[in-house]
Amino acid sequence: SDELFRMKSVPESLTIIGGGVISVEFATVYAELGCKVTILEALPRILPNMDKEISQNLKLILKKRGIDIHTAAAVQGVEADGDQYICKYVEKEKEQSAASQYVLCAVGRCPNTDGLFAEDATPEMNRGRVVVNEKFETSIPGVYAIGDLIFGAQLAHAASAQGIQVVEQLAGKEVSVDVNVVPGCVYTDPEIASVGITEDEAKEKGIAVKVGKFIMSANGKSLITKEERGFIKIVAEEESGVIVGAQMMCARATDMIGEFVTAVANNMTVSQLLKGMRAHPTYNEGIGEALEELEGGAIHVMPKKKK
């Protein structure tokens, strides 16, 4: 994706290989700039690591904006043809192709460790990444590794938190940040944010959960600013009410997710978060409605059917 930032003009057309975060972010921007965008994703849905409902809603929004999206599409190769590139792929067992002025490969990155270590001081590696323990110490005592160099989320804020933990440990201080609670943000329009586990992931782990959801079309500020479809979803343990995850797709989602990062990191319950009053009109009111929905007290959503 670095090369896209060096371009002096907007291409007429762009094919993006991959349907992850980087892909949908660039697709959103370039489509708004008038570029014809095509996304090719090998898995059954875009944003495959996020909540299914988010993937489905974003796909509808992007297609509405003229972006072609092909899922379960296995790319076979890219060939130059005059002043354009032909991206060949297989979809539904049929060979197809997408022609565009440029092709962006957005399927992830590998750590660059070339020349990083001396020959006689190379730590244990696994698939190009440095192996560390829970304290981020490598197989070489006193040598630590954080961020994109190790396994885990390739995010700037995750790397910063890991670095802080290492320094605090070395200084003999109590660790101040829970590095296992990592917010994920997608800068599309509308924004997307997530932390903790989804409802499906909870089921896979055998955790009994309840889910509160608020559709943001009923939010006052969303109506004022004429926002597109969006929602806030909260996942909490069924018996204790402890919040274990949250997924948001709405305006300012990347700013509002912080409330749930704090909640998940501190094992806070739904009732504890409900104690806070939320100003009106704000997007943040949607959080209160989703929390109330978990408790059966939301007044701006359709009531759930009694079991």
For every predicted segment, state its role.
Residues K8-M50, Y85, L155:
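Rossmann-like NAD(P)H-binding beta-loop-alpha module
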Residues S1-P11, A98-L170:
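FAD-site-proximal beta/loop scaffold in flavoenzymes
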Residues P44-P48, A72, V78, V175-E191:
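Flexible, acidic loop-helix segments that line cofactor/substrate-binding pockets
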Residues L33-E134, I197, E204-A208, S217:
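A Rossmann-like FAD-binding core segment of flavoenzymes
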Residues F5, V21-I22, E53, I150:
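Residue-level detector of alpha-helix initiation sites
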Residues H70, E124-N126, K173-P183, I207-G212:
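A short alpha-helix-loop-beta-strand transition element characteristic
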Residues D2, T71-A73, K213:
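Short loop/edge segments at beta-strand edges and connector loops
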Residues A171, Y187-T198, K203-K307:
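Flexible, glycine-rich terminal cap/loop adjacent to redox cofactors
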